[in-house]
Amino acid sequence: MRKLPAAASAAALALVLSACGSDGAEPETVSEGPLPDTFAIATYGTGTSTYADTSAVSEALTAEEGMSIRVVPSDTGIGRIAPMRDGQALFSRGGDEYIYAFEAEYDFAVPEWGPQDIRMTWTPTAPHSVMSLSGSGIDTFSDLRGKKVPWATANPSVQNKMTALLEYGGLTWDDVEAVDISYGDQAEGVKNGQVDVVYQQVYGSSLYELESQHDVQWLELDPDDEAAVERMLEVAPSTFVGSFSGGPAQEEGEETTALMYTVPVITYAETSAEAVHDLATALYGNFESYEDATPTTSGWGLDEIQSVPTQVPFHDGFVQFLEEQDMWTEEAETRNQELIDRQEQLRTAWDEYRESEEGAEPDHESWTAWKDENLA
């Protein structure tokens, strides 16, 4: 059985990259002062809708604010967090690796990582789902039994969501054939028979390309199937059931139910509140210039973003912005402080855990067990 690995100112990235020379100089960060005119943001690989809308937002900020933003693509969670940690990008936008980095889970439960002091700076939401070939016999999630299901390599966020959707269908990885494949190669894998389905954000360009060559269909979630939804949310608590339209394999005006969750822009806590506030202000102030740029950029709007933290705290600069918009509640403040306190507890606990292991290499399973026993 497979184990479950359970806008921004464009200038910041370029600024950071210019500081990472071969002379070993310390990369620049923005620990104080405003958002720089040049910066980078790491995100999913080309061909994904996350890359497309991140690029579209970056281009809009470049045009409207004179920023210079570089988008750095990667198909892996580590590949999207590492540039930010190493000073090659000021921001990152990806899947649940921001949660795993915060908690030091899965690929981050290793000596060179441990708990990361991550903060959320903007929280757009987006739909994700599973697509199959029409006539394949895969019409529902329970039909995945015995089928070749993608196991997105080095991408615990996607692995988690696919695990949750299998649970929705009453299945586990023991019931399917797990196929190692990168997130960005899934659509091509369906074409050549390597996998039977693809899981992605629903507006990815690779899905439109797949639709142009084959008859395809979406596997739908039923929000009224409370038991199935509960099983799914038990595995992926940051998600909810919503609907989307205007995607591949849809007629005009058709709506399809899917898995929804935030795909946030993140940074480290050390980034200045002024810089993050500048980013939030720019994203809000220029929304009309990118709202219709891609099918998912509407999810960057103020009425669509997540306004209460759940598993990772919001940055002080983002909190300041939400307060100015009368969107920051007492409930949100209480939860945010709980999460900030948890990060402090996690970093202390990580050191204690490493000492208790007496030189043994840390790993996800033993660290998770240690947390369950020693942290509330």
Set out the residue ranges of the language-model regions.
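Pocket-flanking alpha-helical
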Residues: 53-60, 70-112, 130, 138, ...
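Bacterial signal peptide processing site
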Residues: 21-24
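Pocket-lining segment of extracytoplasmic ligand-binding domains
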Residues: 96-98, 104-109, 136, 173-175, ...
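Bilobed "Venus flytrap"/periplasmic-binding protein-like clamshell domains
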Residues: 36-64, 69-70, 127-192, 205, ...
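Ligand-binding clefts/hinges and TM-proximal coupling segments of bilobed small-molecule sensing domains
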Residues: 148-164, 239-306, 310
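Bacterial N-terminal signal peptides that target proteins for export
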Residues: 1-9
